[in-house]
Amino acid sequence: MLATGYGEQAALQTIKAANVDSEMGRVVVACVNSPASTTLSGDEPAVLYISEMLRSAGVFTRKLKVETAYHSHHMENVASSYLKSLQGLSSTEIRSDVEFHSSVTGRRKTSDFGPAYWVENLVSQV
């Protein structure tokens, strides 16, 4: 995973311009941290290639010290076992005085916090 000093649109344009899907693997915008900060995730050769592209253009990058490409296609391998492990859990009652904003949708969320939501959070952009 790679933290960048690029916003979402600039990061998406860079991924498209890199044209890495065919040779080096896939890269996605995993996290939109702010209007000027994203985290990329995916296949390491492609992520490293894009990192060099960005550095050459003077854009901040930092490789994250993680062993897994979270919020990418890599998480699809564990999604079903994650779903099964969450099946028996129940959530506590939702408090109306506390607002929850979904990192998946970016909007306020008031219901449907079941296992499927947390799997979506695992495999999707946040």
Model regions and ranges:
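A generic structural motif
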Residues: 36-41
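Acyltransferase
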Residues: 2-3, 12, 55-126
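Helix N-cap motif at beta-to-alpha junctions
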Residues: 8, 42-47
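Short amphipathic alpha-helices in soluble, non-transmembrane regions
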Residues: 15-18, 47-57
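Short beta-strand
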Residues: 27-33, 63, 93
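Short amphipathic alpha-helix segments
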Residues: 3-23
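Generic recognition of flexible, low-complexity loop/linker segments
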Residues: 25-28, 88
